[in-house]
Amino acid sequence: MANTLFDRTIAFAGICQAASLVQKMAKDGHCDQAAFDTAIQSILETNPNNTVGVYGKEANLRVGLECLVRDFDNTPTGSELTRYLISLMALERKLAGHRDGMSKLGERISTIERQLDHFDIHNEQMLSNIASIYLDVISPMGPRIQVTGTPSILQQSMTQHKVRALLLSGIRSAVLWRQVGGKRRHLIFGRKKMVEQAKIILARI
């Protein structure tokens, strides 16, 4: 895959979309269904033709692109999003240095793909199985991501499954970010360029 500003922006928007949906799910118990489906499907796209192929098409990243452009501010919501983003990228770096972890992740995703021959991806058991990949493979690498939201909503098992599945999708996008050459310096010095690129993409979708 190409290491261009466009590719980095797409991958970063994928991480932003996961973080934004986690925040919405934890607070409200629901989120944009199409964006959620894109996030979950991205976990299973392990051999895409290009960067956009992970998400199907540019328009499927509207939530993430809009988040990238406008949501990272100094408000409590913006600070929380930033915390999720940094935590996801830190966990991905730990995963990248853990060969066994990458191998286990691949095996578990292959199992999910086989199960999809028999179950719908929205089935609670399927979402539970995807969530368990995050719990079993990613979470032990630490540090744990503290998700904040409405306590009564966060106590619901379906919400927990969806939040963990979304966190796994964030890890998937963080892996993509690294694969297309994303580095910390791009976040520090190249953020403005990514915002401009995101605006260009949003204008055409």
UniProtKB/Swiss-Prot annotation:
Location within or outside the cell: Cytoplasm; Cell inner membrane
Keyword Membrane in record: yes
Keywords noted in UniProt: Cell inner membrane, Cell membrane, Cytoplasm, Membrane
GO annotations of cellular component type: cytoplasm; plasma membrane
Tree of life domain: Bacteria
Transmembrane regions: none
Membrane topology, from the record: Peripheral membrane protein
Pfam families the UniProt entry points to: DUF489
SUPFAM superfamilies in the cross-refs: YcfC-like
PANTHER family: HIGH FREQUENCY LYSOGENIZATION PROTEIN HFLD
Similarity-based family: Belongs to the HflD family.
Protein name: High frequency lysogenization protein HflD homolog
Gene name linked to the record: hflD
